Amino acid sequence: PTENATITYYLKDRHVFGDMKIEVYNAEGKLMATLPAGKRRGINRVTWAMRQKPPRVPPSPNLAGPALFGPMVPEGVYTVKLVKDKETFTGQVKVIADPKSPHSAMDRALQQKTLWKLYEMQERLAFIDESITDARDKARERAKKLDSKDALAIELEAFAGKLDELRKTIVATREGAITGEEKLRERIVELYGWISQYSGRPTESVLSRIPVLEKEMESANSQYQSIVASQLVALNARLAEKKLDQIKLLTKEEYDKKYKDK
């Protein structure tokens, strides 16, 4: 079966003025996709790739192949809106499982739930990683504004070094086409790939790995918080004394805003 849905509509006349687009909503009213609409007179067909946005993952020299693809949308009825300037025309698309699928609805639902769990873990790890690199880079920027032998510059570099070492435990950082380096990021992405390629019930061995990876991720976040809590207040006080910008930690709101339309 195809992974794309074809949305077909007829226009009596070619649309010339004003905006025109197609919006797809799930049963809860969440916008799932916005598609460019054909404007020519007669029958128009628009393809909806029934996948959601790929998960955001921490940057690394290692390509996160499986994370280049988002999950398939769940089975169900989706509302399609053709927005033509100030007019809106509504229809529906029904997404169903392959009738020949050997997997039960319960097994497919568990696969979707597990896949989304790993999707969210990749997104959370991406935020943790960027929080670490943001604080590290800010510390290094401040250190560069001081004499390299200045005590504060040395402490800032040490602070940045601790954060960098922590980051190396969660993300592969070695440069090269094939390094074989595998850290937390790579293990989560790999598991996401396995589950996304099989629409049936995940095996118990696969399911048992998820809480282990989640514990590693939260441990990394706790270490980051501990480093910050033990050093940042004192560093910021000394930065203020030298009339340098203090190090402000990246917030989730700032992070989400940065990637809102990406």
Model-derived features with residue positions:
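Contiguous beta-strand segments within globular domains
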Residues: P1-K21, Y25, R45, R108, ...
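Hydrophobic beta-strand positions in extracellular immunoglobulin-like domains
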Residues: Y9-L11, M50, V95
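Extended low-complexity, serine/threonine- and proline-enriched intrinsically disordered segments
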Residues: F17-P36, L82
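Glycine-centered tight-turn motifs at strand-turn-strand junctions
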Residues: L31-F69
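Surface-exposed, short loops/turns at beta-strand junctions within beta-sandwich domains
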Residues: G70-P74
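Mature extracytoplasmic or organellar-lumen-exposed domains after removal of signal/transit peptides
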Residues: V77, V93, R124-K262
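Extended, polar beta-sheet/loop recognition surfaces of beta-rich domains
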Residues: D85-I128
